[in-house]
Amino acid sequence: GKVVKIDAKKGKDFETKQIVTHPLFRSEHGGAFVTPNTEYVMEATQYAAPYSDVGYVPLEEFNDKYRGGLTYWKFNKDKGRIEPENSFTFELPPYSQDLSDAGKKDSYGWGFTNSFCTERYVGGIERGRPPFEAGCSSKDTDFLHVTNWKKAEELVKAGKVPMRNGMPVISMEQAVAEGLLYLIPEPKSPHGADVTPDGKLIIVSGKLDSHTSVFSFEKIMAAIKEGKFEGKDPYGIPIIAMKDALHVQAELGLGPLHTQFDSKPCVAYTSLYVDSMVAKWDYCEGKVLDKISIHYNIGHLMTMEGDTVNPDGKYLVA
């Protein structure tokens, strides 16, 4: 996995200034996400694998030896460079981690990362087993990973996180013990965890579910404070029940994907991959306001400053 820094500041040359190679990840999802003040750049694995400091491991040992992960790369704004020596990684289960977003305002200090294939399916169609995609879609839900990067940062600075191949790595055991990592069921095969401008809600769409789910940060924090969990995953990570974290669900259409925000309160736009449409909807009330047909199998979309605390509205690019 690699992260690239390009100089796009006004008057600059738009050339690549830095390429950072991950010392542990063998793959990553093609998306980099920054915390509100660009303290960190979030990079998640996509396909679980043995970390780079481990040799070959057969698929038969997938559950025990393969791992996912989420790295918070420290960014020095004065120098315009990523600082690997001040970055850190969360070890995560061998689920396929997907897109991320950082909390803002009320949820500042926390990060949210999707996942798919929590079935930990490894294929085998040549042996008469279901195709990989089918095996990775057999459950109704996957997991939203909730990480407390602010507290993790303090542990790293205090020298309380062990190094691995030159990178501080917070093991799952340490993350659980320190209250840094939680899981929440989400509609299966999601693609996008989008934090609302006020930081109060997290919007998740599952490509294989017609509903878009809106999670409440306040409810998530209440469940954590009360120790209200429905159980643990196979790696001991506490699971917050979906019903205890959910604010509302909205049935937007087929294949909801990526969400961006309007300048008007509670208004968002979500791409519908299967319907080839964009839905305009109220995420506070869970009501569809409008739909428009658009390019075949639309993917991501963007509104003017639509992922900031002050979206500008005016235009949507699909």
Predicted feature residues:
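Predominantly soluble domains enriched in secretory-pathway, periplasmic, or organellar proteins
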Residues: 1-318
